[in-house]
Amino acid sequence: MKIAILEDYQDAVRHLPCFALLDGHEVDVFTEPLDDEAMAERLAQHEAVVLIRERTCMTAALMDRLPLLRLISQTGKVSGNVDMAAAQQRGVTVLEGVGDPTAPAELSWALLMAAYRRLPQYVSQLQGGHWQRVSDEAVHDTIGRALKGDVLGIWGYGKIGQRMARYARAFDMEVLVWGRAPSLELARADGHRMATSKAAFFAAADVVTLHLRLNDATRGIVTAEDLAGMKSTALMLNTSRAELIETGALKAALQQGRPGFAALDVFEQEPLNTNDPWLHMPNVVATPHLGYVEQKGYELYFSAALRNVLDFVARDKAS
């Protein structure tokens, strides 16, 4: 089978132990983002594509231009990046893999700590020859602070949110939870405090961290009004999906000083270009969507996705 692995930015997949599962198949690994025109041209002879999370959108229009496509193998769970109805109509099988909260939760906590202690700014200044300086501008040259005693506001008490709560307890933070009723009840059973309202949640939290799935109900669920209700010293942490926040609202809120800071691993347009304002805001720590990007997680995700390809081939031969 001719197989394409798409948007492997770091050319990491071919170096994983599980890549050997595809021995005997013709495999092309594409490391650069491709627009629909380029994908239609380069994938015209491929029967299967392996997607890395939501990096690639498989639309009806694109599938129409891939006459040999028979299988889409998704690392992790299938999300809105695949038009499932279009795939079914065109006889394209879509198989999903497994997920794990460990890597995204750890990345979230690392970002939180880096932002709180201003680590990226200190490192940048140190490399420029400046000792114990955060910024060349006095207004931004503020020291960081410890987590102990601060309030971690968790919106979405699923697997990642629960890990964040455990990390917070280890650092002597107070946990405040907001979300749907089942989520709140689970958090209450774990001994955490519930916010009485969304407004109270944003007002009380020193850090707001979002751990929600993106769908029609959650798109833009964090509004400009919510952000304006945060403390001027507060941090907005988003490692889930940029579209959970009303378009343009967070940039405007940061410029107006509420919240005072943001730590972001996700953006509406990815990859970011070097001129993107997010990369030049002194009160923002930005990482290039690394939540699930680490060796153990990749091996887990791709082992499942590549085994799905092999299972598909085996079923096809048996039929």
Task: Describe the function of each predicted region.
Residues 5, 152-154:
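Hydrophobic Val/Ile/Leu positions in short beta-strands of Rossmann-like dinucleotide-binding domains
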Residues 293-304:
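A conserved FAD-binding loop/helix module that cradles the flavin
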Residues 90, 97-151, 166:
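Phosphate-binding beta-alpha-beta segment of Rossmann-like dinucleotide-binding domains, i.e.
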Residues 69, 148-151, 224, 233:
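Phosphate-coordination loops involved in phosphoryl transfer and adenosine-cofactor binding
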Residues 161-162:
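N-terminal Rossmann-fold NAD(P) dinucleotide-binding loop
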Residues 1-98, 223:
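An N-terminal-biased, well-structured beta-alpha scaffold segment characteristic
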Residues 8, 157-158:
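Glycine-rich Rossmann-fold phosphate-binding loop(s) that bind the pyrophosphate
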Residues 41-44, 57-62, 181-277:
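Rossmann-like adenosine-cofactor binding region
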